[in-house]
Amino acid sequence: MHLLWRLLVLLLGLLALPSALPKQPWPGLTKAHKDGRSTLARIIAQGLLKLNAEGRIQSMRLLDRLNVSGTVAPGMVGWLIGGMNFQQQQEISINITNVQLDCGGIQMAFPKEWFSANITLEFDIEFKLPFNSNIIKTHACMGLTAESWLEKDEFGRRELVMGRCRMEPSSGGASMSTEETSPKMKHFLHNLRESLGKVIPNLVESQVCPLIGEILRQLDVKLLKGLVGACS
């Protein structure tokens, strides 16, 4: 009788066991979902840092690009340097400083194994003009999207395909803000900002997009598949 009672207690304990388990078995999957995205974003961010993406952007020669025909407001550069001697022309400078670049997140789509890296970029632009003793500063905030996916070849092997890599339509000059300047400079700076808004996105794309492709191609396809699959 004592043995039968012990078996009955054990049976009741086993029947009660499922109720003690978590009702939702997804916490682990949720963690993997977050980890897959964050790991890939971290790999891209660290890769951009290692490949000196910020330094490349900071060294872009904006003034040279503005002097290329068709990239500036009509007559702007001519108006700027037309009444200057050679020494004054040499004093003109447009420099990028305080570059901050990061991978802000990863978007994914299934079952196509497609993912998109969202790159955030901020920097200051400093203007030094011979007829103005102060350094004029503007601030730019931009976003760049780089698309990629894994595609099977005729033998069923996956390979990385790089898609579009471009600045977001709302990026560029639209997000620039200028510090207070004299009325004499406002019209010139307005035209200059518009011109930079046309020039900078292409320059940034030419510097950052090849680096993202280089970073992703260095990853083992199985590792990349695992990161993407962790979020499915």
Curated annotation (Swiss-Prot):
Highest taxon above the source species: Eukaryota
Residues with glycosylation annotation: N67, N95, N118
Annotated coiled-coil segments of the chain: none
Subcellular location: Secreted
Keywords, comma-separated and alphabetical: Disulfide bond, Glycoprotein, Secreted, Signal
Entry's family note: Belongs to the BPI/LBP/Plunc superfamily. Plunc family.
Name of protein: BPI fold-containing family A member 3
Chain's gene name: Bpifa3
